[in-house]
């Protein structure tokens, strides 16, 4: 699963920009371990997005522009698309689909 590329593709789709998986893979070629956060950021910049890489916890979720890509446990990428009162987090996970997490 190319979770990082798929997440970037979801962000593009949200903003009305449709790109094939092949195009995304050319912009951000995966290695055996997948794509890096830096690689995703560079590809997003090429696609016209402004990116910021930062560490945040759930208390800062109201300050984040949504949707955004999260680097989950340093080994997986997901898209956070909704936060409800800082207690429920709605995530699009390329491997699991739409998932809701609560505190």
Where are these regions (language model features)?
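Conserved active-site-adjacent core of cysteine acyl-enzyme catalytic domains
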Residues: 1-103
């Amino acid at each position: 699963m190319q979770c990082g590329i798929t997440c970037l593709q979801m962000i593009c789709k949200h903003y009305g920009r449709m790109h094939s998986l092949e195009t995304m893979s050319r912009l951000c070629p995966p290695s055996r371990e997948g794509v890096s956060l830096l690689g995703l950021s560079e590809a997003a910049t090429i696609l016209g997005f402004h990116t910021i890489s930062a560490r945040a916890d759930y208390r800062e979720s109201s300050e984040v522009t949504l949707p955004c890509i999260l680097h989950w446990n340093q080994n997986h990428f997901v898209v956070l698309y909704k936060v409800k009162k800082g207690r429920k987090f709605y995530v699009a996970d390329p491997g699991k689909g739409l998932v809701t997490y609560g505190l």
